[in-house]
């Protein structure tokens, strides 16, 4: 598992934001700071400004393609991914609307209002989108506003675009994905299977089903379509090009963001982290993952960063005993993040 998502591949490592996102197929991205570093850690020559510039060029977009969760995905694949996997979230949306006192007619009206407000290449902040809805007489009590923003994106009308300052923005999906790919359903299932096991393998069918939210039957079909593009060894499935590949050289310590595919992409995380440490990584089981320090493929600590004007301060909480030399290696693993944000690094150890 060491360096699983960062290892060299016979086909070469992606060297662009578009390449990394296409390689994974989708990267969880509800927390933008984590999403930026998930890209940056895999693009060592990039700064945060470089990644943001690539997102402004629409090398990737954010929307809710599966599990009702925000992901970075290739723009050209957004429509078919929403049709294939987002449909399950849509199926449950009526029940959600009942709990927040929002009827279907109002939801559809909200989609129309947002579509009109964003027409002509427009881009609006979250607050401006909500103001447009309110101005059209659409109710926004409680969670209704968030649901309408989600619903419009889930239906393939809008997408999340890069922040303006600290504010989330939205635009029409067709403006940011003007040349959509249109595979048929079986082909799409095969694409999802190939991309998942290429980037996450070795993994299992259950892992793919959990990651995508697809049915077991769809996962089975996807694997059949992928055919010899994937290798199977017992319950494990992976890219056959990796089976004779030597372990990743030179990467022993890593500093990964909280919502990273290294932690999120699997049903069983036993090879990555001790069960006794999960509470520290996901406090209270609330789904909010902490950033992790990884040694030899296993999580050995968590970290939190504070961006200042003169330095980035990182507080590290070890989960196992680390010798002084190992702490130095952990600190060295944090240096790429400091370079990414363009600030000197200051490390503080819990209990020190």
Which residues are covered by each model-predicted region?
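Phosphate-backbone binding and catalysis cores of DNA-processing enzymes
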Residues: 1-141, 275-276, 313
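A short, conserved structural fragment
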Residues: 56-65, 69-70, 154-163, 227-234
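Short, cationic-aromatic polyanion-contact patches
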Residues: 73-78, 164-182, 236-248
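Short, amphipathic alpha-helical interaction segments positioned at domain boundaries
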Residues: 83-95, 174-195, 199, 252-257, ...
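Internal, well-folded beta-alpha domain core
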Residues: 113-145, 194-235
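Loop-centered beta-sheet repeat module
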Residues: 142-220
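Non-catalytic regulatory appendages
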Residues: 218, 225-278
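Glycine-rich, small/acidic residue-mixed loop/short-helix segments
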Residues: 275, 281-352
């Amino acid at each position: 598992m060491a360096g699983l998502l960062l290892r060299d591949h016979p086909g070469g490592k992606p060297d662009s934001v578009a390449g990394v996102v296409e390689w994974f197929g989708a990267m969880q991205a509800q927390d933008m700071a984590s999403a930026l570093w998930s890209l940056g850690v895999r693009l060592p020559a990039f700064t945060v400004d470089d990644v943001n510039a690539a997102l402004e060029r629409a090398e990737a977009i954010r929307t809710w393609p599966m599990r009702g969760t925000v992901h970075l995905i290739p723009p050209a694949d957004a429509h078919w991914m929403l049709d294939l996997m987002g449909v399950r979230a849509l199926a449950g949306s009526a029940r959600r609307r009942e709990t927040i006192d929002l009827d279907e007619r109002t939801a559809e009206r909200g989609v129309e209002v947002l579509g009109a407000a964003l027409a002509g290449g427009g881009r609006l902040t979250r607050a401006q989108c909500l103001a447009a809805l309110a101005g059209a007489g659409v109710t926004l009590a409680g969670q209704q506003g968030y649901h309408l923003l989600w619903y419009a994106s889930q239906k393939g009308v809008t997408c999340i675009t890069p922040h303006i300052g600290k504010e989330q923005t939205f635009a029409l999906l067709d403006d940011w994905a003007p040349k959509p790919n249109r595979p048929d359903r079986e082909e799409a299932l095969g694409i999802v299977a190939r991309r998942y096991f290429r980037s996450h393998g070795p993994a299992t069918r259950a892992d793919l089903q959990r990651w995508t939210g697809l049915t077991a039957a769809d996962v089975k079909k996807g694997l059949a379509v992928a055919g010899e593009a994937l290798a199977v060894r017992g319950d494990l499935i992976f890219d056959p090009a990796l089976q004779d590949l030597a372990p990743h050289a030179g990467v022993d310590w890593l500093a990964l963001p909280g919502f990273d595919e290294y932690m999120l992409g699997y049903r069983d995380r036993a090879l990555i982290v001790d069960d006794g440490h999960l509470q520290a990584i996901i406090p209270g089981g609330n789904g909010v993952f902490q950033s992790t320090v990884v040694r030899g493929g296993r999580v050995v600590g968590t970290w939190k960063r504070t961006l200042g004007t003169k330095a980035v301060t990182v507080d590290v909480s070890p989960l196992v005993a680390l010798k002084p030399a190992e702490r130095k290696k952990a600190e060295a693993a944090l240096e790429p993040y400091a370079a990414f944000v363009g600030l000197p690094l200051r490390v503080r150890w819990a209990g020190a």
